[in-house]
C-alpha cells in the first residue's frame, strides 16, 4: 500500500536520511512511541519529497483529493464506529458534524482547486512599463497539522484538504485522547498516500515536542489557548508561520425582543452538540433581566424535548475522559442549579445543566466551559451585555438574538470575535464559502474553502520585465527631467 521504492529513492538522495533505515521511518508513523530521531528522519523525507516537485502539479493534487474521498466513503462505517468509541457520537451526529462536513469541503475544493492554482494577473504600474505582473500561489512546503480530540476526524482531515490542494507535504498529529479515530485516520492515510507525502505521528507530549523541534514551513494547530501559546512560542524559534484555531468563552446575548422559544431551541442545540465539547458552543447567556424567567423556562422545555434522558440517550455524547469530567463537575458548584445537574461517573455523562445566580468572578466564568453547563447572567440591557463581553478576551464566537437591526449592527461594530450568528448558534462554520477562525486569544488565521487554500500557500509576487525597452529615469545620475518623469508616474 506504500510506494517503498519511492521513499528509498528519496532517502538515497538525502545524506541525513542515509543514517536511518527505512523501517525506522515507517515505525515513526506506525507506533505511538516514535523516537525523536525517527521524527527528524520523517521530516527530512518529506522535505526531500517536496523539493522533488512531485506535489506541485495540479493533477497530482486533485488525484490526492479524489483518493482521499474514495477512502473516506469506503471507511464511513469505520469512522462512525471510531467516533462512537472515542466520544459516544451517534451515527447521525458523526456524519452531520464530521464526515459530511469533510465530504462537503472535499467536493468544494475538487471543483475549484484548478482555478485557485492559476496565477493571478494584476495591472502593472505605468512606471514599470513594459512588464507583466502576476501572483503565484506557491505551496508552503512541509506542514504540520495538530488536531484535538473533540472533533477528531473533522479537525484533522479538513485542514489536510487545504494543505493537499495547496501542494504541500503533511505530517498529521492527532490527539492521543481519540485513539480509535486516530487509528482509522492512520489506515486511510496509509491507503491513500506514500509516507513522504502524508504521514501520521501518534503519541503525546514527547512526540509533540519532537515535532515542534523541526523547522516546518507551516504549522496548523487546533486546541486550547494554553497549548496554542506554547506552539506559537516553539514555532517562533524557526520563524514558522502558524495558524491557531483556539477557543474562548463564546457569549450569547438574548435581547428583550428576542423570540424566546426559538432562541432557547437554537441555544439548546448548540449546547447539546457534542455535549458542549465544541470550541464555538454557547458558553454563557447574557439575557435581558425582564425576560430572564421566561427564557429559562423556555430553555428548560427545549432541553427536555431535545434530550429527555441525557444519561442514557444514545444520541448524547459522553465527556471525553475522567480529567474533564472532574473539572466540569467542579464547575457546577459555581451557581444555583435550576435544571439538570445529574451525572453518571461510570459512563462519564453529565446532563445539560443550567446555572443561575452566577457571579462573574466564579470559576465557571474564568475558563472556557467545554461541556454541557450553561450559566445564565441577567443584564439590564444591550449596553451592559456589550460592556460585559467586551471586557473579556476576544471569543471564537458570539451569538445575538434580537429582531432589532440597530442592535445587530451595534453588536457587530462593537465586539471583537472570530465569527458568529444572529438568531442562531454554531452554523456559521458549516460553509466552505466563508473563513472560520479566531481573533486575539481565540486564534489567528482562518480556513475553509478558498481560505484553506490560502492558509497553506504563499502569494509570490512577480514582475516580468520586457527586454525591448528600458526606461532610463530610475538610473543615476538623476536630473530635473528624470525627477519630473518620476513625479509624473508616482502620484
PLM features: residue spans?
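Intrinsic-disorder-associated, low-complexity terminal segments enriched in Asp/Asn/His/Tyr and depleted
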Residues: 1-3, 14, 18, 24
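N-terminal Rossmann-like NAD(P)+-binding subdomain of aldehyde/semialdehyde dehydrogenases
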Residues: 19-134
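Residues at or immediately preceding the N-termini of alpha-helices
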Residues: 39, 58, 76, 260, ...
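Structural signal for hydrophobic packing residues in well-ordered secondary-structure cores
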Residues: 50, 54, 69-72, 76, ...
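Conserved C-terminal structural/oligomerization subdomain of aldehyde/semialdehyde dehydrogenase
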Residues: 57, 253, 304, 349-491
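Residue-level signal for inorganic ion chemistry
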Residues: 61, 106, 167, 198, ...
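Rossmann-like NAD(P) dinucleotide-binding subdomain of oxidoreductase/dehydrogenase enzymes
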Residues: 126-262, 379
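ALDH superfamily catalytic-core signature
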Residues: 193, 226-360, 422, 484, ...
Amino acid at each position: 500500500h506504500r510506494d517503498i521504492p519511492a521513499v528509498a529513492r528519496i532517502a538515497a538522495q538525502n545524506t541525513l536520511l542515509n543514517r536511518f533505515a527505512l523501517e525506522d521511518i515507517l515505525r515513526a508513523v506506525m507506533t505511538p512511541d516514535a523516537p525523536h530521531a525517527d521524527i527528524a528522519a520523517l521530516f527530512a523525507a518529506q522535505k526531500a519529497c517536496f523539493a522533488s516537485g512531485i506535489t506541485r502539479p495540479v493533477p497530482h493534487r486533485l488525484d490526492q483529493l479524489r483518493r482521499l474521498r474514495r477512502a473516506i466513503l469506503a471507511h464511513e462505517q469505520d469512522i462512525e464506529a471510531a467516533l462512537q468509541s472515542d466520544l459516544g457520537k451517534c451515527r447521525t451526529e458523526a456524519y452531520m458534524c464530521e464526515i459530511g462536513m469533510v465530504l462537503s469541503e472535499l467536493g468544494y475544493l475538487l471543483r475549484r482547486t484548478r482555478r485557485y492554482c492559476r496565477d493571478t494577473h494584476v495591472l502593472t504600474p505605468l512606471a514599470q512599463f513594459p512588464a507583466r505582473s502576476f501572483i503565484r500561489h506557491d505551496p508552503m512546503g512541509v506542514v504540520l497539522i495538530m488536531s484535538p480530540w473533540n472533533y477528531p476526524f473533522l479537525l484533522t482531515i479538513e485542514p489536510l484538504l487545504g494543505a493537499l490542494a495547496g501542494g504541500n507535504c503533511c505530517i498529521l498529529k492527532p490527539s492521543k485522547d481519540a485513539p480509535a479515530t486516530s487509528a482509522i485516520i492512520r489506515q486511510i492515510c496509509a491507503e491513500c498516500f506514500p509516507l513522504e507525502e502524508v504521514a501520521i505521528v501518534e503519541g503525546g507530549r514527547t512526540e509533540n515536542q519532537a515535532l515542534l523541534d523541526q523547522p516546518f514551513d507551516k504549522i496548523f494547530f487546533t486546541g486550547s489557548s494554553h497549548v496554542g501559546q506554547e506552539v506559537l512560542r516553539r514555532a517562533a524559534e524557526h520563524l514558522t508561520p502558524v495558524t491557531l484555531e483556539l477557543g474562548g468563552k463564546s457569549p450569547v446575548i438574548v435581547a428583550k425582543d428576542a423570540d424566546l422559544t426559538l432562541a432557547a431551541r437554537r441555544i439548546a442545540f448548540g449546547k447539546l452538540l457534542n455535549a458542549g465539547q465544541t470550541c464555538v458552543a454557547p458558553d454563557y447567556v447574557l439575557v435581558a433581566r425582564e425576560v430572564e424567567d421566561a427564557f429559562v423556562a423556555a430553555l428548560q422545555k427545549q432541553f427536555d424535548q431535545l434530550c429527555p434522558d441525557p444519561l442514557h440517550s444514545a444520541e448524547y455524547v459522553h465527556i471525553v475522559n475522567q480529567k474533564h469530567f472532574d473539572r466540569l463537575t467542579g464547575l457546577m458548584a459555581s451557581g444555583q442549579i435550576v435544571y439538570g445537574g445529574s451525572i453518571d461517573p461510570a459512563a462519564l455523562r453529565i446532563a445539560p445543566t443550567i446555572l443561575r445566580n452566577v457571579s462573574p468572578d466564579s470559576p465557571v466564568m474564568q475558563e472556557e466551559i467545554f461541556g454541557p453547563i450553561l450559566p445564565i447572567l441577567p443584564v439590564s440591557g444591550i449596553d451592559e451585555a456589550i460592556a460585559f463581553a467586551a471586557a473579556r478576551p476576544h471569543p471564537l464566537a458570539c451569538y445575538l438574538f434580537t429582531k432589532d437591526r440597530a442592535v445587530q449592527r451595534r453588536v457587530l461594530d462593537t465586539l471583537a470575535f472570530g465569527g458568529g450568528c444572529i438568531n442562531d448558534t454554531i452554523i456559521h462554520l458549516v460553509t466552505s464559502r466563508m473563513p472560520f477562525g479566531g481573533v486575539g486569544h481565540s486564534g489567528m488565521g482562518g480556513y475553509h474553502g478558498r481560505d484553506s487554500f490560502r492558509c497553506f500557500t504563499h502569494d509570490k509576487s512577480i514582475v516580468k520585465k520586457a527586454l525591448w525597452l528600458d526606461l532610463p529615469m530610475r538610473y543615476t545620475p538623476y536630473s530635473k527631467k528624470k525627477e519630473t518623469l518620476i513625479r509624473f508616474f508616482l502620484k
